[in-house]
Curated annotation (Swiss-Prot):
UniProt family annotation: Belongs to the universal ribosomal protein uL14 family.
SUPFAM superfamilies listed in its UniProt record: Ribosomal protein L14
This protein's GO CC annotations: cytosolic large ribosomal subunit
Function (record text): Binds to 23S rRNA. Forms part of two intersubunit bridges in the 70S ribosome.
Lineage: Bacteria, Bacillati, Bacillota, Clostridia, Eubacteriales
Record has Ribonucleoprotein as a keyword: yes
Gene Ontology molecular function: large ribosomal subunit rRNA binding; structural constituent of ribosome
Native species: Pelotomaculum thermopropionicum (strain DSM 13744 / JCM 10971 / SI)
Protein's name in the database: Large ribosomal subunit protein uL14
A Pfam family this chain is assigned to: Ribosomal_L14
Gene: rplN
InterPro entries attached to this UniProt entry: Ribosomal_uL14, Ribosomal_uL14_bac-type, Ribosomal_uL14_CS, Ribosomal_uL14_sf
Keywords of this entry: Ribonucleoprotein, Ribosomal protein, RNA-binding, rRNA-binding
Subunit structure: Part of the 50S ribosomal subunit. Forms a cluster with proteins L3 and L19. In the 70S ribosome, L14 and L19 interact and together make contacts with the 16S rRNA in bridges B5 and B8.
GO BP term, pick one: translation
């Protein structure tokens, strides 16, 4: 469950290390984002020589959350950290690698490129 001012780790190789959520997309009253939701973020930490720089405003999709997500079969999935992948306007990732597992819910939201690049889909 991500809201405005939440800090997320970055799960790709764009050069960003930490993001801060500044907007949850999906309507004026939308308060929280979960796995598979798109958010607008500010880059708070970045490595030198990366694609994105500190202070850049980017769009990202949430791939892991500490708050559990309920699945249709009644099971729950949760992760040890909040993480996101920086995306372009066409929902494709800006990086070329994805680090760590991602949730299966991304497949239902048409983030197939992220799912195919991920080392593990849970």
């Amino acid at each position: 469950m991500i809201q405005v001012q939440s800090i997320l780790n970055v799960a790709d190789n764009t050069g960003a290390r930490r993001l801060m959520c500044i907007r949850v997309l999906g309507g004026a009253l939308r308060r929280y984002a979960s796995v598979g939701d798109i958010i607008v973020c500010s880059v708070k930490e970045a490595t030198p020589g990366g694609v994105v720089k500190k202070g850049d405003v980017v769009r990202a999709v949430v791939v892991r959350t500490k708050k559990e997500v309920r699945r249709p079969d009644g099971s729950y999935i949760k992760f040890d950290e909040n993480a996101a992948v920086i995306i372009k306007d066409d929902k494709s990732p800006r990086g070329t690698r994805i680090f760590g597992p991602v949730a299966r819910e991304l497949r239902d939201r048409d983030f197939m490129k992220i799912v195919s690049l991920a080392p593990e889909v849970i």
